[in-house]
Amino acid sequence: MKCAHFIDGPHCVKACPAGVLGENDTLVWKYADANAVCQLCHPNCTRGCKGPGLEGCPNGSKTPSIAAGVVGGLLCLVVVGLGIGLYLRRRHIVRKRTLRRLLQERELVEPLTPSGEAPNQAHLRILKETEFKKVKVLGFGAFGTVYKGLWIPEGEKVTIPVAIKELREATSPKANKEILDEAYVMASVDNPHVCRLLGICLTSTVQLITQLMPYGCLLDYIREHKDNIGSQYLLNWCVQIAKGMNYLEERHMVHRDLAARNVLVKTPQHVKITDFGLAKQLGADEKEYHAEGGKVPIKWMALESILHRIYTHQSDVWSYGVTVWELMTFGSKPYDGIPASEISSVLEKGERLPQPPICTIDVYMIMVKCWMSDADSRPKFRELIAEFSKMARDPPRYLVIQGDERMHLPSPTDSKFYRTLMEEEDMEDIVDADEYLVPHQGFFNSPSTSRTPLLSSLSATSNNSATNCIDRNGGHPVREDGFLPAPEYVNQLMPKKPSTAMVQNQIYNYISLTAISKLPIDSRYQNSHSTAVDNPEYLE
């Protein structure tokens, strides 16, 4: 008879014995072979088997070991995390206690707010009153008196012609602040076409010492020599004024009073922007200046400046256009016959200064662009430099002046101003301020060479010269070795033969010290400060 399931000895069973108690109280484990016969497992197989020998014994379970490892790892991570948290918390507490202690030690701790603006490393020279002497009164106005004088630096054997601007006695604190603000701006600039301060003397009445400019202001210079000024000179001056204004823009300075009267002539080939009485320094993030009040030159101002007292570099561009118009008309008055109080309404209606007779449409269109109502539509100073530099390479194409090719201006060494100064003082050691501040090679080893440009070609006698332009500033320019127009934008103009003509000084009046009170005030300068009297060109 055949068993239905498995055979265990003489018995038929449904399953082989697994852990059945046998002899000697031992557990019996059997497995079924290929013939379905139950066979004994190896004695070492204590949990059953699947085949003969030790190979048939089942492996032990690894689950408990794995579980123990996972639990142990998690516990380690928790311990490490708690340790890091405690360390960071302790560090935060220590820093907080340190900061609290520092705040208690100091009365005030200002937070850092970097502006990103470069530091102003300009040098301001403080002069002693014994270092300079006043020679003659050049003029005076509401702000005080301007003298012609000499600066003799302490411990040095040089004499430098200077202009000394002295505030009047009993000046208000506001006027003192204004002149010191002007000194700050002038001391901060360093460009061949911008006047710079030489020094300041802090006596009871503040005195500004600037370079003496022998030819005076450009406005009177072009009026006096209009029959000898050719297209080359006019375009060169336009380039140089634009370069000076572009430098101010790069230094975040708004001039606010650019006009031909505020440009000084060092030589016929070299002009400098001056008069920083209204200039303002903008911050790194500032784009415009809002004025609160004071006298302003209405006829040179942009429309937004007149209406809203907003001043930007683009409002200076408007003033530049008016200045160019003054040059091209040889010193005509802008909007002559129109009261300053009506200028804003005239401009709002679209009226502008007319085209000068000598100007081609190319030049006049540049002026028109400067007078656009939309400030952003006006050209930048760097663009004006490029435009006028191109024109200066071919002057007769852009300015039509009868007899242009025969015109020339006197040599700088024929200056009547310096000649008068030398007749009164011992000028053996005189040097120009440019050479003193930026001396050329061999300056200290060869005194005679260094002074030749100032002393040569002085043969004629001098007479007092009348003027209607009072100096407000001088300058500290970078030396230019007698300065001749740069070849990239100038076709050199030189006289065919030396001229003995003497240039009348257009910016200074020679007045005796006893006659100061009788000097008529210059209408263009009298209202530059808040203490000034009324003037139609400068209105509140």
Curated annotation (Swiss-Prot):
Catalytic reaction list: L-tyrosyl-[protein] + ATP = O-phospho-L-tyrosyl-[protein] + ADP + H(+)
Superkingdom, natural source: Viruses
Entry GO CC: plasma membrane; receptor complex
InterPro entries: Egfr_JX_dom, GF_recep_IV, Growth_fac_rcpt_cys_sf, Kinase-like_dom_sf, Prot_kinase_dom, Protein_kinase_ATP_BS, RTK, Ser-Thr/Tyr_kinase_cat_dom
Keyword ATP-binding: yes
Single biological process term from Gene Ontology: negative regulation of apoptotic process
Binding site for ATP: L138, G139, F140, G141, A142, F143, G144, T145, V146, K165
Gene Ontology molecular function: ATP binding; epidermal growth factor binding; epidermal growth factor receptor activity
All copies of domain Protein kinase, residue ranges: 132-399
EC main group: transferase
Coiled-coil residue spans: none
Record-listed E.C. numbers: 2.7.10.1
Active-site positions on this chain: D257
SUPFAM superfamilies (alphabetical): Growth factor receptor domain, Protein kinase-like (PK-like)
Family: Belongs to the protein kinase superfamily. Tyr protein kinase family. EGF receptor subfamily.
Protein name per its UniProtKB record: Tyrosine-protein kinase transforming protein erbB
Species name: Avian erythroblastosis virus (strain ts167)
